[in-house]
Curated annotation (Swiss-Prot):
<dbReference type="GO" id="GO:0000028">
    <property type="term" value="P:ribosomal small subunit assembly"/>
</dbReference>
<dbReference type="InterPro" id="IPR028989">
    <property type="entry name" value="RimP_N"/>
</dbReference>
<comment type="function">
    <text>Required for maturation of 30S ribosomal subunits.</text>
</comment>
<protein>
    <recommendedName>
        <fullName>Ribosome maturation factor RimP</fullName>
    </recommendedName>
</protein>
<dbReference type="InterPro" id="IPR035956">
    <property type="entry name" value="RimP_N_sf"/>
</dbReference>
<dbReference type="InterPro" id="IPR036847">
    <property type="entry name" value="RimP_C_sf"/>
</dbReference>
<dbReference type="Pfam" id="PF02576">
    <property type="entry name" value="RimP_N"/>
</dbReference>
<dbReference type="GO" id="GO:0006412">
    <property type="term" value="P:translation"/>
</dbReference>
<keyword id="KW-0690">Ribosome biogenesis</keyword>
<keyword id="KW-0963">Cytoplasm</keyword>
<dbReference type="GO" id="GO:0005829">
    <property type="term" value="C:cytosol"/>
</dbReference>
<comment type="similarity">
    <text>Belongs to the RimP family.</text>
</comment>
<dbReference type="InterPro" id="IPR003728">
    <property type="entry name" value="Ribosome_maturation_RimP"/>
</dbReference>
<dbReference type="Pfam" id="PF17384">
    <property type="entry name" value="DUF150_C"/>
</dbReference>
<dbReference type="InterPro" id="IPR028998">
    <property type="entry name" value="RimP_C"/>
</dbReference>
Length: 152
């Protein structure tokens, strides 16, 4: 056993999403008020549209009903990751090199828990950002979240 609900869900739905020519960006399972929500974020080159989200919602719903990894009732939501999409996989950090990102850490690092800068990339086990011509390497092990940041 040992797998978390999220790991089970990702393993079940990733092939379905990939078969549609889409990327599984993130999965969230959260309780808001009295209701549980399973949120699936998908993307593709050029972005996703409502038809992509509707199609994935139907396909994912079928496969999750078949495997039933979540015991309680939940609402399924499928959407684009938005402008401030999360960066999780190595490929995300490669793809968005040069973009403005925000990194939150689980613990203070060099006196801070929040960093914003242009993504230089991954170097070994560090996320490297550049801010005001200074480079900073943040250990990936202490990163809580990394997201693209919208530039005005």
């Amino acid at each position: 056993m040992g797998e978390s609900i999220m790991e089970q869900v990702e393993a079940i739905i990733a092939p379905v999403i990939t078969e549609q020519g889409l990327e599984l960006v993130d999965v969230e399972y959260v309780k808001e008020g009295a209701h549980w929500y399973l949120r699936i974020y998908i993307d593709k080159e050029g972005g996703v549209d409502i038809d992509d989200c509707t199609n994935v919602s139907h396909l994912v719903s079928e496969v999750l009903d078949k495997h039933d990894p979540i015991a309680q009732a939940y609402m399924l939501e499928v959407s684009s990751p938005g402008l401030e999409r999360p960066l999780k996989k190595d490929e995300d950090f490669e793809r968005f090199t040069g973009k403005l990102v925000r990194v939150l850490t689980k613990e203070a690092y060099q006196g801070y828990k929040e960093f914003t800068g242009y993504l230089v990339g991954l170097i070994e086990d560090d996320i490297v950002l550049e801010y005001e011509k200074e480079k900073m390497a943040i250990p990936r092990a202490i990163v809580d979240k990394a997201n693209l940041t919208f530039e005005f």
